[in-house]
């Protein structure tokens, strides 16, 4: 029975190379399709794959062909309709029209746009391409280092459970080859001499017997070389290395006053989901802290954060104070990469906005990697926006954007996290 072993890198997915080439070639068209599709999804369906359509005009290959008109001589294969010197009428030009996407001919046949499915990973790669986390610094603790075990080559000492059989046998083969190479070479020379004496006249029996004894002694010496020796043994070596902190926490602060309707909350939720997916691709562990506020702030779970009917007036500083308390209790800035995203319609008690400015400037912004504020409203900006504009001018880790419609969410998100020119890729 014959066994075939497929050692190709893409053996299980033989078209992967062509697929990757296609994604690179038509990246701009695919990104345009994704940017439009992100706004049509439900808030719980941001992480799945996507069906992408590309107009046929964008994927047509350039070809060399004869232009229209002119006099040309062609050689056609023979058939039962024409004979030599017959004149063939020019076919009429296509007059079919189309009111939709794709191409339509005069006989009713057409061609749809090219549609294909991209996977979740491909979708997220294109969704977050050219984006980077601002002020990204993986924490390296001095007192509370996190250690992770890594492979670190091989060692000649160790426990039996870590023995490397393959490396040990390789060393055994090298040692036995080195120790017996001279003896095997001598045996080959003696065997050649023995053949010469056997064919020589007169026959030298004593000399032949002496050579046979030498060959036997050499083979005994070769057999006495141990197959495996403690010198050959190699063990897999492991070492513990300090790891930079790879954990982050996102504080989601949302105004739930009476002016924040469900449509506004859904737009805020889309932003929070994009932020979570973006951070989870950078950090291994991402915690979410949900804080709702009206006149009072409360930490809640995800369901209550988006769907609770509790409402009231608006005091934004209550959420900022609660965020500071949670950081002190559970999230040491030396161990956690802290991010915050605040969503509001901008409506706040006028006397509270200066307090929000003070809390952010003196208490929160020194602790967080990045603080983003989105104001979802079609009205004119109020005191909270003006206070935050001063923070944006003073702090590099503070950013703010204005959202009017659902279509603004993804472009605004890219503006907040666009990779800076001086950041390494």
Curated annotation (Swiss-Prot):
Residues 49-109 are annotated as: Disordered. Belongs to the UPF0229 family. This is UPF0229 protein SG1344. It holds the Pfam family DUF444. Residues 77-90 have a biased composition (Basic and acidic residues). It comes from the Bacteria. Residues 50-59 have a biased composition (Polar residues). PANTHER family: UPF0229 PROTEIN YEAH. InterPro entries: UPF0229.
């Amino acid at each position: 029975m014959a066994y075939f072993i497929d050692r190709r890198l893409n053996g299980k997915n033989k078209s992967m190379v062509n697929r990757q080439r296609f994604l690179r070639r038509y990246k701009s068209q695919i990104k345009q399709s994704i940017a439009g599709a992100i706004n049509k999804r439900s808030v719980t369906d941001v992480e799945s794959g996507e069906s992408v359509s590309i107009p046929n005009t964008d994927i047509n290959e350039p070809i060399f062909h004869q232009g229209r008109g002119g006099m040309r001589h062609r050689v056609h294969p023979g058939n039962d309709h024409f004979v030599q010197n017959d004149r063939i009428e020019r076919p009429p030009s296509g007059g079919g029209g189309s009111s939709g996407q794709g191409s339509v001919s005069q006989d009713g046949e057409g061609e749809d746009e090219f549609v294909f499915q991209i996977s979740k990973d491909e979708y997220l790669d294109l969704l977050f391409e050219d984006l980077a986390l601002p002020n990204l610094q993986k924490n390296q603790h001095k007192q509370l280092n996190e250690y992770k075990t890594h492979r670190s080559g091989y060692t000649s000492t160790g426990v039996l459970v870590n023995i490397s059989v393959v490396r040990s046998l390789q060393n055994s083969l090298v040692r036995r080859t080195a120790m017996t190479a001279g003896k095997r070479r001598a045996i080959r020379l003696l065997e050649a001499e023995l053949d010469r004496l056997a064919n020589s006249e007169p026959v030298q029996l004593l000399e032949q017997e002496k050579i046979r004894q030498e060959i036997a002694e050499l083979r005994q010496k070769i057999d006495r070389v141990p197959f495996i020796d403690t010198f050959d043994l190699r063990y897999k070596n492991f070492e513990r290395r300090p790891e930079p902190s790879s954990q982050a926490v996102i504080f989601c602060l949302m105004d739930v006053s009476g002016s924040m309707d469900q449509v506004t909350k859904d737009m805020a939720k889309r932003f929070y989901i994009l932020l979570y997916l973006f951070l989870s691709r950078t950090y291994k562990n991402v915690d979410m802290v949900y804080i709702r506020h009206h006149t009072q702030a409360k930490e809640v779970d995800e369901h209550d954060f988006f769907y609770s009917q509790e409402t009231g007036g608006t005091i934004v500083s209550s959420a900022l104070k609660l965020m500071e308390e949670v950081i002190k209790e559970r999230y040491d800035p030396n161990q956690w990469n802290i991010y915050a995203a605040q969503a509001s319609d901008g409506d706040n008690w006028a006397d509270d906005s200066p307090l929000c400015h003070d809390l952010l400037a003196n208490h929160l912004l020194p602790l967080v990697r990045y603080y983003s504020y989105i104001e979802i409203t079609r009205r004119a900006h109020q005191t909270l926006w003006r206070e935050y504009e001063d923070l944006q001018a003073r702090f590099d880790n503070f950013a703010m954007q204005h959202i009017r419609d659902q279509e603004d969410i993804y472009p605004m998100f890219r503006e907040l996290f666009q990779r800076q020119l001086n950041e390494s890729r």
